[in-house]
């Protein structure tokens, strides 16, 4: 009989109750849907196999206790011991779940028998997803790289549980192409009473998995928790129980059981459009959201504008539509259609007061575009100098301006399609502004400065602090770009007027 396994807490174990899910709730990530959508899609984009756009499917479904009871065997007593309220859910006949599946991706690669991370970081996602916490095989150049994104799934489940199904591409990868399946739960430390009157205390982590001896390596012959493989019926049982679409296509499928009522189809559609509308509009991503009745919405480059227009009317809705239009306009520009500022002297501390950044001719071009109500694109060169090798690599960001009927609007920042939603930047008057960071060098620099929720940049993160020349100053320089570009252009006109007045 298949059952869940939890490890008894030993004398050397810490009394640890995980809190990682709490880090994904911020001012701009207000709903469970936002957490799941932002984390899952950024991981899917990072896992792009290179064969074309990434496709992600979210589905909301209903499960019954009778049809899924075997998948939860041995779990409920641990859930109830950890959280009495969550344990009561075992008596309910029906429950809601959400599935997240990606296609056009690599799946969780790596040897499933690598229980200690000996295979290193490269192409070893299975180890980092299943066996590691707070560690990742990614770098700052990728959209997510803290190794805790999976906790958004666990946090969304009222029993802190998920099921994982993955298939891998390639010609005979170690551990096979799959599909591989495993259940994971992260509860609290909990105590279970035994019939003899004694009790056992268990650590938070539980698995629905095979426990069998390893077949090779330094730990050959020792028992380990391993996923169910293609020779087991478990991948098919999980697929059938939760109506997963994956057969043997490379990629990752995650099931989040027992989700709360507020995680709905409408919230998922709204969150995808809000957080990834620009990336979808570019053609790099397509998303389908399916509800409990089979009704679905597809968000792709052909439909994203219509989906945005179909959202509930609000200032945010119009803002998203205008941002999409501005971003798509900017994406098609050539060098002669944008203004490229000068390179900042490397020996000077980053400052928008530096004279060589903007010529008088460029300032006039910017003012003329603003006066005529046209869209405007400005490219800003940014030097990246890691202390590790002291070699400067020039990168850039693009700022797009467009007319707005709103008096003052806050600039919005996108790093490789991900909306960095809480960047503190001064508002601009009468204009909409987007800062687009797609170049890998600057994306890696700023990605290293992001926390686990990827909503702001800070020079104090462990992956950023002390790693770059003038690192903190360049972050401030990027934040201030929209306001400072306009200030420089307008101050040049004021200087010109003063000179004319003096001559007169």
Residue ranges and their predicted role:
Residues 51-61, 66-74, 162-212, 223:
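Flexible phosphate/Mg2+-sensing switch loops adjacent to catalytic phosphate-binding sites
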Residues 81-179:
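Flexible ATP-lid and adjacent glycine-rich G1/G2 motifs of the Bergerat
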Residues 42-45, 60-63, 102-105, 113, ...:
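An acidic- and aromatic-residue-enriched active-site/binding cleft used to recognize and process polar
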Residues 53-57, 96-98, 150-152, 160-163, ...:
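Beta-sheet entry/capping signal
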Residues 1-101, 109-114:
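Bergerat-fold GHKL ATPase/HATPase_c domain
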Residues 2-6, 10-11, 26-35, 45-49, ...:
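N-terminal assembly/transducer modules of large multi-domain enzymes
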């Amino acid at each position: 009989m298949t059952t869940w396994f939890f490890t008894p807490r030993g004398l050397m174990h810490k009394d640890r109750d995980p809190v990682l899910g709490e880090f994904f709730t911020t001012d701009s990530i207000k709903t469970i849907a936002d957490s799941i959508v932002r984390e899952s899609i950024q991981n899917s984009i990072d896992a792009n196999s290179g064969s074309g756009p990434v496709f992600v499917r979210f589905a909301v479904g209903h499960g019954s206790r009778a049809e899924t009871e075997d998948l939860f065997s041995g779990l409920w007593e641990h859930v109830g011991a950890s959280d009495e309220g969550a344990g009561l859910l075992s008596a309910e006949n029906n429950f809601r779940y959400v599935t997240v599946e990606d296609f056009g991706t690599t799946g969780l690669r790596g040897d499933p028998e690598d229980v200690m991370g000996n295979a290193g970081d490269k192409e070893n996602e299975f180890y980092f997803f299943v066996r590691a916490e707070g560690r990742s095989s990614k770098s700052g150049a990728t959209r997510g790289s803290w190794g805790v994104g999976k906790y958004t799934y666990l946090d969304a489940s009222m029993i802190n549980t998920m099921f994982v199904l993955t298939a891998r591409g390639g010609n005979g990868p170690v551990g096979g192409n799959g599909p591989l399946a495993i259940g994971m739960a992260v509860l609290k430390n909990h105590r279970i009473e035994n019939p003899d009157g004694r009790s056992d205390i268990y650590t938070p982590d539980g698995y629905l998995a095979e426990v069998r001896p390893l077949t090779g390596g330094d730990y050959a012959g020792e028992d380990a928790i391993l996923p169910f493989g293609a020779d087991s019926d478990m991948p098919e049982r999980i697929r059938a129980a939760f109506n997963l679409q994956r057969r043997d296509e490379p990629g990752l499928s995650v099931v989040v059981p027992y989700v709360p009522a507020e995680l709905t189809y409408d919230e998922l559609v709204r969150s995808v459009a809000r957080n990834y509308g620009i990336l979808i509009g570019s053609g790099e991503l397509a998303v389908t959201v399916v509800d409990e009745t089979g009704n679905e919405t597809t968000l792709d480059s052909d439909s994203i504008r219509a989906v945005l227009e179909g959202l509930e009317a609000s200032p945010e809705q119009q803002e998203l539509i205008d941002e999409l239009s501005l971003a798509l306009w900017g994406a098609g520009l050539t060098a002669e259609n944008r203004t490229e500022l000068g390179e900042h002297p490397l020996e000077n501390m980053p400052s928008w007061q530096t004279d060589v950044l903007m010529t008088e001719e460029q300032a006039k071009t910017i003012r003329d575009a603003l006066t005529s109500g046209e869209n405007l694109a400005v490219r800003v060169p940014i030097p990246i100098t890691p202390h590790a090798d002291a070699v400067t690599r020039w990168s850039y960001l693009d700022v797009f301006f467009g007319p707005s009927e709103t008096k003052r609007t806050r600039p919005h920042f996108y790093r490789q399609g991900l909306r960095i939603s809480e960047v503190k930047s001064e508002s601009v008057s009468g204009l909409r502004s987007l800062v687009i960071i797609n170049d890998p060098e600057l994306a890696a620099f700023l990605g290293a400065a992001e926390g686990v929720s990827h909503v702001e940049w800070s020079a104090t993160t462990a992956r950023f602090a002390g790693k770059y020349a003038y690192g903190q100053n360049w972050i401030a320089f990027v934040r201030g770009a929209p306001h400072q570009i306009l200030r420089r252009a307008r101050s040049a006109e004021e200087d010109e007027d003063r000179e004319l007045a003096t001559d007169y």
